[in-house]
Amino acid sequence: MKIRSQVGMVLNLDKCIGCHTCSVTCKNVWTSREGMEYAWFNNVESKPGVGFPNDWENQEKWKGGWIRKINGKLQPRMGNRAMLLGKIFANPHLPGIDDYYEPFDYDYQNLHNAPESKHQPIARPRSLITGQRMDKITSGPNWEEILGGEFEKRAKDQNFDNMQKAMYGQFENTFMMYLPRLCEHCLNPACVATCPSGAIYKREEDGIVLIDQDKCRGWRMCITGCPYKKIYFNWKSGKSEKCIFCYPRIESGMPTVCSETCVGRIRYLGVLLYDADAIENAASTENEKDLYQRQLDVFLDPNDPKVIEQALKDGVPQGVIEAAQQSPVYKMAMDWKLALPLHPEYRTLPMVWYVPPLSPIQSAADAGELGSNGILPDVESLRIPVQYLANLLTAGDTQPVLLALKRMLAMRHYKRAETVDGVVDTRALEEVGLSEAQAQEMYRYLAIANYEDRFVVPSSHREQARKAFPEKNGCGFSFGDGCHGSDSQFNLFNSRRIDAIDVTSKTEPHA
């Protein structure tokens, strides 16, 4: 057992109002510069729909994530090393700018400088890539906002698999939900494995996946390898870039920008302890529907004395262990099993989790339109199809989704009886296996959580930071190893980050 810590995130889709504040603030902070105009580290999609970039969930087209070979071993869906080398100069599975959108701005100065005329002046769109005027805007990062466009195009959503989707094109059967997306900072990231330069690495102290800009050579294999399409190519610098989980803020014990500015307060940040030695076995599970449970098995109980003892031996600081014990992510994903991972069938073991939406369900239940199954309404006949949510969050297995929805309904039933009727009705809680204490804690975290409840982020230990002196003036001509001053041989498929050599320790003091 090798214990590591990971900062994870939970997004409560039941409370997302689709305001895009998280997207705009992230854009202003990280990608409001030349070369990254089309990139959105955080974006909010309306589901059902093909998303951004177009049809990103279609891995038969984009070849992202992992596949399990006959011998039980994992391999990137793109292929083995020889196949990657064969595509390195012409990758047929790379999204083009039309799969994203051509970024644009408007000629606002024309509104001020236009000469007097019989017609009102207009601000025409202008491409931010070519600088030329655009005849027509044909796409955007939220092009399908609030079910924009005809159902025929939105019906290409991969989450409609194994469903009779034609009926959902009728107005009376239509449904909608918001899905905020960012880099998943996976436990088993496919982008790390597919980078020919070994430029992508996962930090041991918090699990954040980053791209070393010194080592990146712009091969763009990582863009194809990432099944969530959350790596973007900076055409100005020739490097790939991605969500950095606001690690400068995380190191200071602060939440990410998207979490800090979220209007609906849907985001939760916390630490999870996991067994790094169990990742390969979990990701190699034969049945895709078992991947969710196998990922849960990787996580460890931070209150277990044996886990605490081993974590301290493995170098996990005491402050991180204490933060893991108070983690809202652990409570929602492990204790209550409300939060579910996004597309676990990609076998990357994602670390951004989602609480399935309940608002349309509850409104229908209140209107008396649903049959009941015991105390709770029959959640299998609700407006948002359970199978759709299962295809999105649990590789098609409806049981975890049903349990999460029933537990949220049970908590609301219990609190309504307590608040409105003044009685303690635990029948609904008993039906879904919850105690009164768990229901009260769920209510506190889901409804009235304070800032310190939603964000439990331990600050980094500065005493463990390496010295920056070796980096100073140390970038000469290099190939593969970047500017890290490494004396190791070049390795095209370098799987680990090369640390800098502290030259100060080799310098003898003057007599």
Model-found features: residue ranges?
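Non-ligating segments of multi-cofactor redox enzymes
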Residues: 1-511
